[in-house]
Amino acid sequence: RAVTGEVIAYSHSNEISKNSLKNSSENLKSTLKSKKGTYNHSIPKSNIKYYEDKNPLDDKSFSSKVKILEEIDKYTRSKHPNIKQVTANFLGEHKTVEIIRSGGEIISDIRPLVRFNVSVVVEKNGKKETGVYGIGGRQSYDDYLNNENWKKVCDEAYRIASVNLNSKPAPAGEMKVVLGPGWPAILIHEAIGHGLEGDFNRKKTSAFHNLLNQRVASEGVT
């Protein structure tokens, strides 16, 4: 990100390399110098194939999906008698994306996507809890949803439900909090830090912009 006056320019890359960082910085310079609202920079071409162009919608028949779901239901319920409900579902998606840039350049992509989710309801002494887990990826059903994968999903959904069933309510209400050095500072930053940033105070959009040399926190904050 680069800032010049009221102009902010962003540049990003999907590739983590020294060259991509260098190109991004050069793009920022060109954008800030441009008088137009956007900078039309050519996209580097790549033949890297991260996933196949299979269509998961044609991958399995309805009956084969029902058979797998029945196996999933049977396997999950066999894990413990306190399991009262099992819900499993598949999601298949096939997208064809085409981007036409202002200069006439055309870029297209075929994107398959499969998703598998399991929800497990457990009950003990009248108390019910739910565990939900799922996986997904740009692959076909056959490549992704094998026995090993879906059993892991069922196991994890049941584990989460069991943890919830045996969990205790977290303490609530007002309480004293002591923050040490290091990562706890993020809590302070998210609570008030953005309002203390220079741009917001310069533009007088922050609640603190006119409170210079005045107390803005309770006496307990040191």
Residue ranges and their predicted role:
Residues 1, 10-12, 117-119, 176-178, ...:
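Structured core elements
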Residues 1-31:
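N-terminal cap/recognition module
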Residues 1-4, 108-139:
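Short beta-strand elements
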Residues 3, 8, 85, 102, ...:
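Broad gene-expression machinery/nucleic-acid interaction feature
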Residues 3, 119-123, 178-180, 189, ...:
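Generic beta-strand/beta-sheet core signal
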Residues 19-110, 142-185, 206-209:
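Acidic low-complexity segments
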Residues 106-119, 195-205:
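Acidic, His- and aromatic-enriched active-site or binding-groove loops in soluble protein domains
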Residues 186, 191-222:
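Conserved, structured C-terminal
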